[in-house]
């Protein structure tokens, strides 16, 4: 399915990867949001389950392996073009995750990857909803529990 001017919304997943008091952020190298900071994530592939998509996207973009916990947020991300047509429309499901291995390095469709505190996230060029979900995740880190999303 093409990303721009889709026939229907595209399902995407995001990972709020938390390590202590910091969360992982990436700088997007492709549209939409090229040059902006975000959390690792992307589109699900056909036949791919949610948690598989999260693990794959984080590994592709950052080189890290993650354990997936619960859903943090679900929201629409709609980008109209100059004529008012819907150029991009995503339904995004963000999950709380923690790093389990690998070596942090930007790759795939990101130009940078780094760890930030909640305060630092607020000072980056980043959508307010992303800053909010990072702050929510950092407030929940003491309550991490295995994902209620089925593993099969």
Question: What annotation goes with each model-predicted range?
Answer:
Residues 1-14, 85:
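Acidic, metal-coordinating catalytic segment for phosphate/diphosphate chemistry
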Residues 15, 71, 95-97:
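A structural signal for short, well-ordered beta-strand segments
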Residues 22-60:
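Conserved Nudix-box catalytic region and its N-terminal flanking loop in Nudix hydrolases
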Residues 65-74:
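A short coil-to-beta-strand element that immediately follows conserved catalytic motifs
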Residues 76-103:
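Active-site-adjacent beta-strand/loop module that shapes the phosphate/pyrophosphate-binding cleft
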Residues 94, 105-137:
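NUDIX/MutT-family hydrolases
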Residues 131-152:
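Charged phosphate-binding loop/patch that engages nucleotide di/tri-phosphates or the phosphate backbone
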């Amino acid at each position: 399915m093409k990303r721009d001017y889709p026939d229907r919304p595209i399902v995407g997943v995001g990972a709020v990867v938390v390590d202590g008091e910091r969360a992982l952020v990436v700088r997007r190298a492709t549209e939409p949001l090229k040059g902006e900071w975000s959390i690792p994530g992307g589109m699900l592939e056909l036949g791919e389950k949610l948690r598989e998509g999260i693990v794959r996207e984080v590994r592709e973009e950052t080189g890290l392996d993650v354990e997936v916990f619960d859903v943090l947020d679900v929201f629409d991300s709609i980008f109209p073009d100059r004529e008012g047509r819907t150029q991009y429309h995503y339904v995004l499901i963000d999950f709380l995750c923690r790093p389990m291995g690998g070596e942090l390095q930007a790759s795939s469709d990101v130009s940078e990857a780094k760890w930030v505190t909640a305060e630092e996230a607020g000072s980056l060029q980043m959508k307010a909803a992303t800053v909010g979900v990072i702050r929510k995740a950092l407030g929940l880190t003491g309550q991490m529990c295995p994902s209620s999303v089925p593993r099969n």
